[in-house]
């Protein structure tokens, strides 16, 4: 590019060459100069002076300071040639220091744009630069990226050119922090597209559209931009601008989508920030506007506008208001609309000034002045008192009635703010919709370029919910950049087999994104909290930290800072750590409005306000599910969910386009021009992935082209590499083309489907192409100019001759004009002509009448056409209605999805409630444990009291022993109580563990639900993708229908692929329906499981209540017992006192003795009562223990059932996951098949090389074997015969292998042809559409010419009108038939193809007839014009015109006859097409027979191998066997030669069988691995159960050891089986090696025998070929004779066919020779397949052995199960005996209670202890029996699974055996059907060639007819011009 084209902008874009040379002239030592880290400038320049042993380097800075730095911190410096380079990807040393230095130097010279690989880096200059003028736009228009300096216009031009060339939508993404310049650059891009579109074609309408596009941004900035701390004109909303273009690059329309308007700014701004610009523009406006809006000029008078700053130095609000009004006028805003926006803005300002106060002595509120309310109500068109009333006393719905509710001052203030925010947001959305309507030019749309300008990343002092949504959006966009630049790029290299070392990309942001948007992320928790009425910001915070703190590194607790705002949590984003304040998040997310005030707004007289709230739906007017009103009310969707939905839509739009990234950099925080903060820039470069993206772009291959596209575009560079005489694949052509050019061959790589180029290499190719094209065009122009000059010279010669003739005539006239007779002629001539004028007038009148009739007829025809047009429009409207109905159904589906989401949220809420209940139960358990602790304390106190009693009873010697016994008894009872307490504690722990288990199960179920929902979403995405693919297929099919007459040959090939796609789609749809049913079943299972959990919780609660009651009873008993103990203590004390008194007295009276006796009786009675109470307590405690144990057993059983249900659900989930994986694998089968084919090809080639190597080795051993030949012949003739047979088999298999490899190569060629034909079809379709449009225009012009001819010719026109009417009727009929055929083609493609073929043939014949008639009509019209001109001069010419008219009539009759003949020809062609169809169907049948024959041949080959193994004959029969083998060999060769064509067709079937065998292997391996996993899982489960029982039951240790021993035994058996399998594989490989060596020896011996038989076989082959040649020549000669008798043209065609037939014979001969080699390859492949089949059989046998072993193990397990059952029965019997003993003991205990006073206390205690021991043993036995039953159940399940596995293995073995038997039978039948198939194939080939030639004839005739039509149209136009001139 010439810098002079840029004008004054050149100095800011690129340095001149002299300046660059001056910069690059500095000397640099690359080994010493380097960059070192610096604290102030990040990196500074230094020079290496030396190094030390510890790895440090001594450097010297530019200031002379010497430093020692570690070597790894030094970064190399680039040479001066790269100083201020325009693309940083070209740097020699790509490091942070070099990138920073380059950006810093360019920014210092005000070069703000720099390329970094595929994307552009721009730095905000913070001042205006003259680089955006129109001359700069014109200079960048159409320039390649390498031609012009870096600029945002270059990015826009690149996107524009990619859109036109690649026919793909584009997008330009601006990313960066706030204040980096995203909005300004997006404005310049929009300006560029608008200006360039205006340059392409200047139209009034188009010019208006460009002006409107430029002005739309002004309105959006006024209403959506505001001043922030970092930016004076910051966009507080995101926008995605789609600029739609037509097919030729014309700008057709523009639409805008907005995202996340910051509503909170309307009512509050931080210090230093400002409200939206429109508020201050209105306040700075003229007085008339102030009077209209009732506002003043001071922003401080309004609360909503004065929270922060009120002025901006860089903005003039008054001028901005004028620009806003001008933009609204240009966009066509009506005055009501414009002032409606102003009024609502003013109303919001007055709204903010409204104040309220408390009424004195009342609790109600009232307005503190009504002035502001009156102003706001006036501007909004509502009643002021009603507004205030609705704010203070809103109506709410309670049940079915409405009730007024009083509000507080805070609530009213919040309601006013919410209404203001909602009003402004709705007004802004209305503005965007209005701008979109204005920018919709109703022109055709083809592609679009999207421009994304999203609010930049924000880290403010006070960060709220808006900042979280903004930063989340930037996280998603940065992740999209990483995914597109790093993941997709490197995956493309791997997929295309390009050698590549993966490069990591800085930061992976998915973890942070998941933390925000995953099901239990921040937004999800916020949504969940908004659903609960009692939720607060504090509950949201606690739930957030409970779920994620400590689990996610991106969530942190903030450090308290008194200087800043309070932060509740911090998030680690890619751009830094951001503290968030959650105050008011729930209210912001709900975004609730005062519905009473909204109802007043809906009745407003202000039309704009009423329309804004027209669609608002209250919370009590929700539409029931299933109705079709609208998708979702505004009140039912939160801010977070709406933003998340819009963001997902934006990401899908971006992923459907080709993105172009612009990374905007903020140079400094203070907004000072020219200053660059290095650390700030480095942080942005690291976060944006600039270095990694540049490295990938430099080392990778960012540009790539399909082989066909590359061949089509660059074939002009070397046309010699594309010979027209033979076919060359696209890849081979690309390789030869690039290899022939003088270029750097390291700059490109060849992939599988594409050719990849380094960055900038395509620009070199484009330059070479432009140079070649310029040469071609100059040569073409020279030839054309020479031709034109020759034509001009010839015209000059003709004019000279005409002048000479005219001069001669004038001289002759001058010589005779004075003769007398000549003067007499001059006088008589006018008189004669006057008599003829009347006749001419009469003739003209007749012509006028005839023309009037013709005009009436044409009008009638026009009316008919209008009626048809009306009917077509009606059909179009019907289709539109159908489309709308489908859209409604789609909306219903979306509503159902939303309903499902709601139900999911409700279920989650239910789960939350259950978890809360569980927490309550846990609290109850904690209370119980606390009570247990209290009981322990009481026991401790009782122990103290007992000790006191012991000290007191020591005094009495007589009662010492009794008191000691009592104390012992009491201590034992206390121990028993402690045991009870410990048991209760254990039970509480068990219940608590059960609760915890239920919680874990619930959590697992929630995870299952989330995984199922994800799987459902994936399936829905797959359905959407399949629907999109289906829609594309439908469009392609409709295009094919329009151009079917040109694509008949290719349609047959595409039909099968279409049917396969449709069948696969139906299959996928059915599977999806099955998956949905299974998903619903899973949901029902989850519901059932939740019901079970609820039942378990109920039972737990009941048990807890029972425990509580029992504990209360226990406490009551203890209290009574304590009382008894206290009374007993008192009595013992009294007794002691009495004894002391008795001892003191010594001998007292009888009264005292009676008193003592009474006291003793009382004491004994009390003691008896106490013992009865203790017995009662013990019986009740035993019963309670028993009940508690039973309840625990029931709970354990229920828990086990739940675990079983859980296992089933997990198994179902795994099955579903496997089925989903199967679906995905089916989708990828085509690619796998292709890859497998290529792998097989490489495998065949490797085997071929190995065979050649082995053959070389064998030749060395040939001499030794020849010496031992006689000895071998004498020793074993039988062995020699076997060797000969194996040699024959090897030769046969090698031929088949060669055939297979050649067929694979042919298939590759066919695949490339198909891809090429598909691309050609696409181009042909586009060309056909253009031709169709041209034909329509020409047809209209032709109608006009015909109308003019009607006025000139009366008689001719009458006849032509009749003919035209007939023709048009026929055409209409044909078009209707075509439409019917199109409809039928959508149902059945086969019938449509036939119908369209017939219709096309008829249309072609009619077109030919019409063209011939029009040609003759043009000739007749030209003759008639000559006649009329001659009649004006001479009367004699009138007779000639009559003759010409008669001749024309005769020609017309001849043309009519020709038309009839053409119709007959059409009928004949249709019959031939039917015959061709029949032959095609017969060929299909023959193909199927050939497939069966191929299978029979394979079976025969297997039989031959068996015969080789089984054959045992003597040496004397060797010669006979030799002759038989030779004859059989010749026969096999003849049959194989005849079946070569069939083998080509059946190659795909053989490959399919190979794939099936491989799949069967994989299936067996997968099943074995699954079974191993199941065994491993079973072992783990057994281990877990054994570990859990080990702590509680020591007796279960033996069973655990036994189970582990069995598992070890099974693992050892498995290892032994694997060793056996590996040994068997080794033996098979050794056997195959030995077999290969024997075959090599056989081949050497057989070569000597083949030499003698080769001559005979060659002669026989030549004879057979000659006979076939003769037969083919005779048939073709007969065809040629029949064609010669028809027409002379047929004779020429038959001669050509004869030549082609001879060439075909030669081709057949060459093909036969090539197929012989292929047959050898096929034979080798068949042998390999047999080996593989044998291996599969061996594997099946091994699997069967494994199954047998598994069955043996199952039998062992069943025996163990029987033993377990016996032990269980024994335990049951012992339990019954124990129960009987317990009953006996209870009876004995009752008897002992009666004898308690008389009996011994020790015996009772022994009995009680025995009872307790028996009860403990009973409980232990019960637990053991339960565990044994559970183990038995598990063993039964294992046995069932093993038996099922054995049955499956047997079924697989039987299936494989049947497949092998079928293959062998098919190989046997193949040989018998080969000859018939070959003859049929030859017949079909000959018939197909004939039909192909006939089709070529038809096409040639069509081309001739088209050329005649064009000539006739040209003549008709010339004739029309002549008639107009006359």
From Swiss-Prot:
SUPFAM superfamilies: Myosin rod fragments (SSF90257), P-loop containing nucleoside triphosphate hydrolases (SSF52540), Tropomyosin (SSF57997). It comes from the Eukaryota. The modification N6,N6,N6-trimethyllysine is found at residue 127. Residues 833-1926 form a coiled coil. Keywords: Actin-binding, ATP-binding, Calmodulin-binding, Coiled coil, Cytoplasm, Methylation, Motor protein, Muscle protein, Myosin, Nucleotide-binding, Thick filament. Residues 83-770 form the Myosin motor domain. Residues 647-669, 749-763 are annotated as: Actin-binding. InterPro entries: Kinesin_motor_dom_sf, Myosin_head_motor_dom-like, Myosin_N, Myosin_S1_N, Myosin_tail, P-loop_NTPase, XRCC4-like_C. GO terms for cellular component: cytoplasm; cytosol; intracellular membrane-bounded organelle; myofibril; myosin filament; myosin II complex. ATP binds at residues 176-183. Residues 773-802 form the IQ domain. The keyword Iron does not apply. Muscle contraction. Muscle myosin is a hexameric protein that consists of 2 heavy chain subunits (MHC), 2 alkali light chain subunits (MLC) and 2 regulatory light chain subunits (MLC-2). PANTHER family: MYOSIN HEAVY CHAIN, NON-MUSCLE, MYOSIN-15. Belongs to the TRAFAC class myosin-kinesin ATPase superfamily. Myosin family. The rodlike tail sequence is highly repetitive, showing cycles of a 28-residue repeat pattern composed of 4 heptapeptides, characteristic for alpha-helical coiled coils. This is Myosin-15. It comes from Homo sapiens. The lineage of its organism: Eukaryota, Metazoa, Chordata, Craniata, Vertebrata. The gene is MYH15.
């Amino acid at each position: 590019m010439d810098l002079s084209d840029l004008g004054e902008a050149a100095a800011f874009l690129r340095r001149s060459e002299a300046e660059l040379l001056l910069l690059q002239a500095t000397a640099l030592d690359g080994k010493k100069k380097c960059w070192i880290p610096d604290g102030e400038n990040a990196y500074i320049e230094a020079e290496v002076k030396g190094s030390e042993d510890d790895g440090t380097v001594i450097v010297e800075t530019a200031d002379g300071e010497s430093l020692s730095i570690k070597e790894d911190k030094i970064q190399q410096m680039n040479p001066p040639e790269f100083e201020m380079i325009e693309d940083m990807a070209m740097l020699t040393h790509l490091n942070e220091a070099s990138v920073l230095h380059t950006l810093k130097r360019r920014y210092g010279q005000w070069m703000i744009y720099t390329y970094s690989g595929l994307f552009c880096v721009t730095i905000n200059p913070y001042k205006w630069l003259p680089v955006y003028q129109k001359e700069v736009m014109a200079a960048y228009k159409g320039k390649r990226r390498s031609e012009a300096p870096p600029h945002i216009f270059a990015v826009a031009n690149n996107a524009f050119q990619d859109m036109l060339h690649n026919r793909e939508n584009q997008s330009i993404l601006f990313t960066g922090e706030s204040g980096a310049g995203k909005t300004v650059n997006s404005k310049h891009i929009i300006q560029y597209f608008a200006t360039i579109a205006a340059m392409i074609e200047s139209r009034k309408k188009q010019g208006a559209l460009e002006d409107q596009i430029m002005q739309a941004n002004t309105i959006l900035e006024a209403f959506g931009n505001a001043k922030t701390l970092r930016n004076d004109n910051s966009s507080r909303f995101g926008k995605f601008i789609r600029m739609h273009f037509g097919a030729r690059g014309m700008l057709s329309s523009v639409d805008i989508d907005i995202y996340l308007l910051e509503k909170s700014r309307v009512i509050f701004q931080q210090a230093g920030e400002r409200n939206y610009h429109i508020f201050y523009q209105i306040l700075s406006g003229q007085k008339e506007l102030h009077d209209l809006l009732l506002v003043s000029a001071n922003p401080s008078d309004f609360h909503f506008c004065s929270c922060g700053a009120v002025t901006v130095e860089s903005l003039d609000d008054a001028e901005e208001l004028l620009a806003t009004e001008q933009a609204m006028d240009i966009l066509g805003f009506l005055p009501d609309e414009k002032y409606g926006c102003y009024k609502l803005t003013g109303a919001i300002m007055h709204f903010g000034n409204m104040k309220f106060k408390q009424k004195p002595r009342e609790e109600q509120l009232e307005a503190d002045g009504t002035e502001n309310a009156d102003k706001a109500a006036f501007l909004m068109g509502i009643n002021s008192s009603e507004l205030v009333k609705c704010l203070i006393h809103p109506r709410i719905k309670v049940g079915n009635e409405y009730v007024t509710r009083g509000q507080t001052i805070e609530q009213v203030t919040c309601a006013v703010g919410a209404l203001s925010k909602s009003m402004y947001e709705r007004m802004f959305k209305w503005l965007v919709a209005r701008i979109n309507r204005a920018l919709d030019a109703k022109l055709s749309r083809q592609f679009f370029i999207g421009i994304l300008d999203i609010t930049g990343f924000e880290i403010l002092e006070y960060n709220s919910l808006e900042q979280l949504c903004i930063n989340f959006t930037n996280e998603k966009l940065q992740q999209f950049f990483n995914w597109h630049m790093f993941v997709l790029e490197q995956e493309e290299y791997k997929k295309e087999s390009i050698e590549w070392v993966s490069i990591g990309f800085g930061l992976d942001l998915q973890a942070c994104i998941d933390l925000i948007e995953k099901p239990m992320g921040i937004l999800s928790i916020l949504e969940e909290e908004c659903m609960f009425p009692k939720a607060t910001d504090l509950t949201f915070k606690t739930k957030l930290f409970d779920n994620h703190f400590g689990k996610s590194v991106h969530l942190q607790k903030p450090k308290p800072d008194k200087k800043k705002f309070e932060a509740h949590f911090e998030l680690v984003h890619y751009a830094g750590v951001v503290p968030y304040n959650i105050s008011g998040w729930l209210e912001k997310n709900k975004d609730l409005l005062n519905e009473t005030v909204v109802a007043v707004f809906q009745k407003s007289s202000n039309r704009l306000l009423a329309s804004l709230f027209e669609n608002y739906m209250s919370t009590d007017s929700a539409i029931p599910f299933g109705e079709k009103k609208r998708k979702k009310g505004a009140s039912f969707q939160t801010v977070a969910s709406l933003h998340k939905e819009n963001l997902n839509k934006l990401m899908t739009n971006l992923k459907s386009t080709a993105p172009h990234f612009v990374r905007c950099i903020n140079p400094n925080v203070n907004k000072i021009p020219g200053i660059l903060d290095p650390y700030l820039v480095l942080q942005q470069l690291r976060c944006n992935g600039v270095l990694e993206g540049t490295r990938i772009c430099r080392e990778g291959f960012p540009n790539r082209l399909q082989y066909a596209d590359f061949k089509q575009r660059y074939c002009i560079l070397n046309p010699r590499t594309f010979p027209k005489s033979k076919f060359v694949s696209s890849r081979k052509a690309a390789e030869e083309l690039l290899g022939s050019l003088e270029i750097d061959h390291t700059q490109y790589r060849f992939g599988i489907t594409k050719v990849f180029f380094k960055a900038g290499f395509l620009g070199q190719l484009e330059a070479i192409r432009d140079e070649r094209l310029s040469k071609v065009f100059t040569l073409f122009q020279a030839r054309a100019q020479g031709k034109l000059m020759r034509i001009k010279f010839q015209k000059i010669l003709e004019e000279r001759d005409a002048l000479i003739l005219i001069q001669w005539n004038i001289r002759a006239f001058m010589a005779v004009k004075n003769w007398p007779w000549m003067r007499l002629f001059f006088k008589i001539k006018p008189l004669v002509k006057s008599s003829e004028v009347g006749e001419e007038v009469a003739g003209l009148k007749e012509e006028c009448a005839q023309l009037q009739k013709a005009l009436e007829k044409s009008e009638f025809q026009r009316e008919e056409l209008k009626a048809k047009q009306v009917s077509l429009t009606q059909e179009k409207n019907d289709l539109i209605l159908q489309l709308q109905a489908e859209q409604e159904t789609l909306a219903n589906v979306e509503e159902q999805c939303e309903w499902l989401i709601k139900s999911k949220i409700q279920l989650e809420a239910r789960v939350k409630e259950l978890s809360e209940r569980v927490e309550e139960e846990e609290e109850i358990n904690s209370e119980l444990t606390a009570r247990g602790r209290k009981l322990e304390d009481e026991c401790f106190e009782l122990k103290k009291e007992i000790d006191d009693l012991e000290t007191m009873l020591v005094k009495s010697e007589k009662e010492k022993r009794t008191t000691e016994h009592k104390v012992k008894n009491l201590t034992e009872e206390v121990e028993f109580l402690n045991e009870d307490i410990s048991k209760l504690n254990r039970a509480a722990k068990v219940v608590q563990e059960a609760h915890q288990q239920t919680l874990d199960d619930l959590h697992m179920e929630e995870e299952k639900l989330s995984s199922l929902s994800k799987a459902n979403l994936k399936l829905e995405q797959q359905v959407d993708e399949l629907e999109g693919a289906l829609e594309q297929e439908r469009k392609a099919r409709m295009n094919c229908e329009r151009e079917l007459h040109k694509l008949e040959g290719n349609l047959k090939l595409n039909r099968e692929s279409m049917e396969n796609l449709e069948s696969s789609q139906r299959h996928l749809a059915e599977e999806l329906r099955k998956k949905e049913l299974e998903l619903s079943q899973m949901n029902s299972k989850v519901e059932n499981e939740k019901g079970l959990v609820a039942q378990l919780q109920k039972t737990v609660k009941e048990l807890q209540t029972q425990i509580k009651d029992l504990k209360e009873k226990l406490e009551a008993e203890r209290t009574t017992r304590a009382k008894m103990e206290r009374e007993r203590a008192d009595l013992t004390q009294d007794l002691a006192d009495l004894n002391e008194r008795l001892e003191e007295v010594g001998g007292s009276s009888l009264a005292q003795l009676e008193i003592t006796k009474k006291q003793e009786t009382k004491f004994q009675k009390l003691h008896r009562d106490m013992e009865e109470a203790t017995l009662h307590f013990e019986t009740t405690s035993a019963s309670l223990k028993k009940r508690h144990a039973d309840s625990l057993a029931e709970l354990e059983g229920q828990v086990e059932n739940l675990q079983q249900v859980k296992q089933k659900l997990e198994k179902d989930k795994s099955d579903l996951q496997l089925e989903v994986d199967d679906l995905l694998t089916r989708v990828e089968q085509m690619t796998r098949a292709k890859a497998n084919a290529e792998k097989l090809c490489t495998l065949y080639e490797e085997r071929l090389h190995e065979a050649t190597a082995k053959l070389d080795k064998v030749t060395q051993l040939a001499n030794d074997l020849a010496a031992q030949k006689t000895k071998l012949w004498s020793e074993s003739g039988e062995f020699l015969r076997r060797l000969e047979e194996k040699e024959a088999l090897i030769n046969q298999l090698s031929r088949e292998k060669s055939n297979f490899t050649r067929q694979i190569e042919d298939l590759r060629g066919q695949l490339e042809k198909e891809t090429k034909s598909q691309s050609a079809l696409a181009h042909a379709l586009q060309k056909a559409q253009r031709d169709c449009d041209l034909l329509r225009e020409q047809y209209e012009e032709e109608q006009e010419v015909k109308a003019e001819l009607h006025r000139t010719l009366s008689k001719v026109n009458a006849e032509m009108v009749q003919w035209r009417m007939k023709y048009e009727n026929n055409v209409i009929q044909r078009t209707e038939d075509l439409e019917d055929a199109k409809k039928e083609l959508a149902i059945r493609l086969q019938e449509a193809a036939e119908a369209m073929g017939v219709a096309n043939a008829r249309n072609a014949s009619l077109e030919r007839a019409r063209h011939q008639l029009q040609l003759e009509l043009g000739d007749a019209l030209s003759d008639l014009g000559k006649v009329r001109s001659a009649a004006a001069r001479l009367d004699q010419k009138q007779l000639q015109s009559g003759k010409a008219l008669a001749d024309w009539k005769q020609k017309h009759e001849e043309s009519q006859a020709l038309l009839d003949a053409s119709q007959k020809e059409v009928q004949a062609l249709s019959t031939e097409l039917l015959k061709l169809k029949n032959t095609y169907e017969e060929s299909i049948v023959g193909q199927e027979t050939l497939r069966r024959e191929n299978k029979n041949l394979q079976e025969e080959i297997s039989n031959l191998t068996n015969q080789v193994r089984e054959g045992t004959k003597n040496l004397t029969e060797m010669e006979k066997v030799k002759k038989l083998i030779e004859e059989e060999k010749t026969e096999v060769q003849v049959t194989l030669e005849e079946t070569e064509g069939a083998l080509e067709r059946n190659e795909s079937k053989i490959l399919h069988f190979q794939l099936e065998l491989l799949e069967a292997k994989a299936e067996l391996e997968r099943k074995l691995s699954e079974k191993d996993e199941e065994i491993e899982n079973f072992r783990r489960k057994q281990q877990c159960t054994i570990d859990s029982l080990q702590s509680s039951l020591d007796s279960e240790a033996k069973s655990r050891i036994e189970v582990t021993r069995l598992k070890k035994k099974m693992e050892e058996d498995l290892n032994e089986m694997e060793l056996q399998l590996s040994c068997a594989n080794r033996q098979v490989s050794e056997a195959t090696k030995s077999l290969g060596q024997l075959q090599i020896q056989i081949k050497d011996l057989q070569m000597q025998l083949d030499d003698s038989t080769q001559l005979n076989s060659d002669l026989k082959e030549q004879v057979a070929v000659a006979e076939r040649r003769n037969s083919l020549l005779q048939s073709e000669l007969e065809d040629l004779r029949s064609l010669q008798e028809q027409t002379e043209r047929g004779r020429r065609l038959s001669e050509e066919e004869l030549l082609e037939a001879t060439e075909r014979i030669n081709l057949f001969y060459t093909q036969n020779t090539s197929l012989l080699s292929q047959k050898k390859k096929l034979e080798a492949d068949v042998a390999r397949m047999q080996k593989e089949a044998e291996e599969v059989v061996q594997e099946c046998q091994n699997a069967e052995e494994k199954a047998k072993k598994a069955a043996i193990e199952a039998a062992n397990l069943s025996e163990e199960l029987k033993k377990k059952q016996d032990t269980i029965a024994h335990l049951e019997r012992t339990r019954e005996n124990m129960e009987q003993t317990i009953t006996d003991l209870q009876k004995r205990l009752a008897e002992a209670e009666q004898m308690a006073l008389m009996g011994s206390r020790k015996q009772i205690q022994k009995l009680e202890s025995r009872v307790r021991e028996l009860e403990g043993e009973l409980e232990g036995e019960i637990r053991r029996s339960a565990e044994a039953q559970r183990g038995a159940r598990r063993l039964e399940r294992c046995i069932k699974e093993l038996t099922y596995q054995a049955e499956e293995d047997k079924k697989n073995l039987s299936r494989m055996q049947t497949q092998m038997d079928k293959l062998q039978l098919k190989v046997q039948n193949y040989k018998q059907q080969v000859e018939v198939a070959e003859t049929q194939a030859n017949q079909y080939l000959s018939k197909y060639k004939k039909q192909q030639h006939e089709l070529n004839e038809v096409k040639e005739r069509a081309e001739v007819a088209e050329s005649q039509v064009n000539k006739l149209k040209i003549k008709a136009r010339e004739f029309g011009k002549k008639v107009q001139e006359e």
